[in-house]
């Protein structure tokens, strides 16, 4: 299915591009499973759920310079706030050429640049913020957005957050501030999978109507009902981009499935932070055959 790129009025992605994105996503799932299995530690559930989104964002939507720089001048920049989904982040960065894919084999090892939660201390290309503590990424992204405005850099800032992360009060200060200051060059995406470490978000602390809350704070809101469909993701991102620089910050509500692509991990918080055993790894890899070559 082809869709319209709302910014350039061209049909995109093509079938060839869609196939490429699907192949990268499948390989990314393999990377995630193998990374957390090797060290018997990590967060596969949310990583799998955001694979399609991050693959599409980095490969088809974001404007990225060939060489990574922390200042991000004259390019779009991305902040991962829910840093526990580092496996998918590292895989996407590696598959985009930020660093060698073989380095994925060092995930969570001592002295590795690929720690369980991303940090800037290791100097890993693509990582702009340490994001172990939840609820801080949006504030930093808003600061970066203001910096771009001051420097007359007409590129965008993206931030990915978890839905359970909205239970952190700092987010709501940031949400209020961004609208009050017309920070209209930011696109914040909320991964709405309805799961967090202790159970469903409804059982832990109900989020209520997230769309209504963001709109009441002065944000434009785009909903992607199938956040695991690449075509829908692309369309939603392009629609979000078309809403930028119009006086309001933009929020995407991305409705994903925890553990998507591995049947026994789907729809449950139990795989928020648990690694598969040998048998489970084999099943997961069979469901996601190698497409780009394993590291």
Spans of features found by a protein language model:
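Anionic-ligand anchoring segments at beta-strand to alpha-helix junctions in alpha/beta enzyme folds, i.e.
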Residues: 100-120
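N-terminal amphipathic, basic-rich helices that act as targeting or association modules
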Residues: 2-86
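Alpha-helical support elements that line or immediately flank enzyme active sites
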Residues: 88-99
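Flexible, glycine/charged-enriched surface loops at secondary-structure junctions
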Residues: 42-44, 104, 251, 295
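A residue-level signal for conserved active-site and pocket-lining positions in enzyme catalytic cores
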Residues: 53, 89, 252
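Glycine-rich ThDP/TPP pyrophosphate-binding loop and its adjacent helix/strand module
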Residues: 63-71, 75-77, 116-295
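Generic structural signal for well-ordered, non-membrane alpha-helical segments
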Residues: 14, 18-21, 25, 29, ...
